[in-house]
């Protein structure tokens, strides 16, 4: 018999909650920051908002972070896009 702890590895076939989307987005921000793809001041910033938004390919979680430490106003809001199944789909400063 296989005993499971309720945690899956790899791709999940269950939809995640908004709370779980925030956790995954925060983890992705740490990785982006460590890889120097975004400013290190993003690390540790709590999500400002999470919402489900429908795009051309279907619904996704959008997790929004705001960082007043960034000098360029167009880059003070960072959007992370996460599939309903928990995969990181992308990140940008426009929300589109």
Where are these regions (language model features)?
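Boundary of Sec targeting at the N-terminus
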Residues: 2-6
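Exposed beta-strand-loop-beta-strand "reactive/processing" segments of non-cytosolic proteins
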Residues: 40-84
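Detector for Asparagine
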Residues: 27, 34, 67-69, 92
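Serine/proline-rich low-complexity intrinsically disordered segments, especially terminal tails, linkers
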Residues: 7-10, 85
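A short, surface-exposed interaction/processing loop segment used at functional sites
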Residues: 78-96
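Short, non-transmembrane alpha-helical segments in secretory-pathway proteins
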Residues: 10-52
């Amino acid at each position: 018999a296989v005993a499971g702890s309720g945690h899956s590895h790899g791709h999940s076939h269950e939809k995640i909650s908004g709370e779980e989307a925030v956790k995954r987005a925060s983890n992705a921000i740490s990785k982006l920051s460590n890889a120097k793809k975004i400013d290190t001041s993003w690390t540790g910033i709590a999500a400002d908002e999470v919402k489900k938004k429908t795009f051309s390919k279907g619904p996704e979680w959008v997790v929004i972070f705001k960082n007043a430490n960034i000098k360029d106003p167009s880059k003070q809001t960072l959007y992370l896009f996460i599939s309903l199944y928990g995969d990181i789909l992308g990140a940008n400063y426009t929300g589109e």
